[in-house]
C-alpha cells in the first residue's frame, strides 16, 4: 500500500517573537522543517505535501522540489490546514501521515513503527500518543473501558476528568487517505477556539464504528512541539545529547560532552578525541585519530586523519593527514593544507594551498598564495595581496626559506630553494636558488645614544 505525507508548516509562530517563520528556526544546524522532512523519508512517501502560509516563499525554498506545496491563506486550525492538501491527495488509495513541521525530535524509526502499527491493526486512523507527566496544554486521549480510543479532547474543551488524563496527542497521525478527506468535509468550528480541529475526524470515525488506534511513543521527548524559545532550547539540548551519544557509540571520545556543540550533518571517524567547548558545524568531516582541543571551532571543513587542532578556527578548508594547527590560528575559506603542514600560533591563512611539510609557525598572514612543499615561513611574514581594488597571488616554490618579518608584495613568485632575508620587502621575482635582500643597510652611530633626552647621562 502506498504512503503519503502532509507536513503542516503554515503557522507564524507568534510566541517565537520572530520575523522568521517558526518552522525555519534551527535545531543543531537544520531547520525544524528539515528535521521533520528527513524523518518523514523513513516511511518512503509516494508524495509529500507541505502546507505553507506565513512567509510561504521562505518555507518553500527550504524543501524546494522535494515536496509539493499548498497554501493556507488563513490559519483556521489543523483540520483546515489538512483540507488544503485535498487537491493533491484526494481519491488516492493509501495511508497518509499528518505531522507538524515544528516537531524536530520525532525520529524516522518512530514514524516507521507508527505506519506499521496502523497497517497491522487495519485502522482507519492511528494517533501517535505519549505519556506526559504534566499534560497541561495538550489534547488528551480518551479511551473507553476496553481501552479503545473514542476521542481526542483539546485542553480548552476538556472537562475535569479529561484534564487528569496523562496520555496526550502528539499531533501526528496516520489515516486511510480516502476516509480522511471524506471525514474532513463533516467537521465544524463548534468548539472553544472556533477552529477546524483535525482531531474531530476521530469522533466521526468512531461514530461510524470504524477502527481508531493509538501508538504510544517510548520517548516522550520525541513529542515535543516547539512554540517558543524555551521549547527551542529544550529541543536543542535533546538533539545535542543524541548527536554526541551517536558519535560516542561510533568510537569518538568526548572529554566533556555537555559543553560541545556538534550539528546534525557533521561526520566524525572513530578514535577522534574532542575536548570541551568544541564547535563543529555544517558539512564537516573529522578523520580518524584527530585531536580537537578546547575552544576549537570548525565549520564546513574536511580534517584528515591524525591531525591536531589546538584552540583554532577553521572555515571551509581542507586539511590532509597529519596537519597541526594552532593554538590561535585562523584558517579562512578556500584554504588547503597538504600532509604534515604546521600552522602555528596567530597565523591566518585564506584562499591558499600549502604544500606538504611546510611550516608557518608564528604571527603570519598567508592570503591568495600557492606555497610549495617543505617551505619555512618565518615569523611575521605577510603576503600583501590587496591593492584596494584587486587581489593578487603569491607563489612560493618548494624548499624556499622565507625569513622572519618578510613582506611579500603580490603578484610575486619566489622560486624553489630561494631565500628571502629577514626584514625584507620583496616586490620582484626571486629566481630559483637565489637570495633576495630587500632592506636598507644598517648604519651604526657610536656614542650617539648619549644625546637622547632619556639617556642616564643626561640626568646628571
From Swiss-Prot:
Record-linked PANTHER family: BIFUNCTIONAL PROTEIN GLMU, NUCLEOTIDYL TRANSFERASE
Enzyme class: transferase
Family, per entry: In the N-terminal section; belongs to the N-acetylglucosamine-1-phosphate uridyltransferase family.
Entries under CDD domains matching the protein: GT2_GlmU_N_bac, LbH_GlmU_C
NCBIfam families the record matches: glmU, PRK14354.1
Cofactor: Mg(2+)
Reaction equations catalysed: alpha-D-glucosamine 1-phosphate + acetyl-CoA = N-acetyl-alpha-D-glucosamine 1-phosphate + CoA + H(+); N-acetyl-alpha-D-glucosamine 1-phosphate + UTP + H(+) = UDP-N-acetyl-alpha-D-glucosamine + diphosphate
Pfam family, one: Hexapep
Record-level GO BP terms: cell morphogenesis; cell wall organization; lipid A biosynthetic process; peptidoglycan biosynthetic process; regulation of cell shape; UDP-N-acetylglucosamine biosynthetic process
Transmembrane segments: none
Organism this protein belongs to: Streptococcus pyogenes serotype M28 (strain MGAS6180)
The name this protein goes by in its record: Bifunctional protein GlmU
